[in-house]
């Protein structure tokens, strides 16, 4: 086997490793190595092994923590266990933001966990903002295929120059590709990683119909398996840059494998309950980064015919995969 052939084989294997597995093999860190308490006093408790932390919401206050460093791109992950029983109005967030540095034009990448009344399941919401574009909501909401209150499950965000990918238990559930027309709407400035629990009674559950009932407090969320793998930068630099070779490999990691993409499509068809890309009441012309999937559109129209009753003009139609091909894919 010649040198060029051996090199091409190595690069093929390396790309597969990075995109498929390496992100899940990144080292875990102790809480004090990467984070600082943000608020909450005694409502934040670090386990004596230093690897896990509890955030609590009670009548007095919520709680939260923030990364010690500020990052320009990276992979950020934690295994989280949510409060059980009645949790309406409770919001638990795992997100990137620079709102403290850029009050009028901040960026944000969100995982939000929205509590519910007894007998109804938690919901997950993902969202992104760039350059203060809060007037353009890019929310998606989902149910899960497991009970997130019974055990820990891993939630991860990959943020690169061109992609944002949200994962649940290593399954990609949402991919945002940067488009030229997005401009500053794509998060591009250095951000910190935050985790918080707080009272979102005004909006979190059925638009505020059900609020937090402190009779069931304290509400406790637990975090472990903490991963902070990114390019730490100095935000005071005029043009902060990321030159870390390991972080540059995020470009490769953002290439979703065929197996991962199949799992993502199945998840979205089974568990997605809202996407701004299909909300024709909100957007008459779909935003540029949206790729409309006919199967997703059909399911959402059945789920909520008023909101998703038609497909807006101007969308890009995704490649349609045959039903037989999806049937061969592992169920989620």
UniProtKB/Swiss-Prot annotation:
The keyword Transmembrane does not apply. The active site is at residues 108, 112. Residues 313-332 are annotated as: Disordered. Disulfide bonds join 277-290. The keyword Hydrolase applies. GO terms for cellular component: apoplast. Keywords: Apoplast, Cell wall, Cell wall biogenesis/degradation, Disulfide bond, Glycoprotein, Glycosidase, Hydrolase, Secreted, Signal, Transferase. Residues 1-22 form the signal peptide. Xyloglucan binds at residues 112, 125-127, 135-139, 202-203, 207, 282. Glycans are attached at residue 131. GO terms for biological process: cell wall biogenesis; cell wall organization; fruit development; stamen filament development; xyloglucan metabolic process. It catalyses: breaks a beta-(1->4) bond in the backbone of a xyloglucan and transfers the xyloglucanyl segment on to O-4 of the non-reducing terminal glucose residue of an acceptor, which can be a xyloglucan or an oligosaccharide of xyloglucan. Its EC number is 2.4.1.207. It is found in: Secreted, Cell wall; Secreted, Extracellular space, Apoplast. PROSITE patterns: GH16_2. Catalyzes xyloglucan endohydrolysis (XEH) and/or endotransglycosylation (XET). Cleaves and religates xyloglucan polymers, an essential constituent of the primary cell wall, and thereby participates in cell wall construction of growing tissues. This is Probable xyloglucan endotransglucosylase/hydrolase protein 28. It comes from Arabidopsis thaliana (Mouse-ear cress). The gene is XTH28.
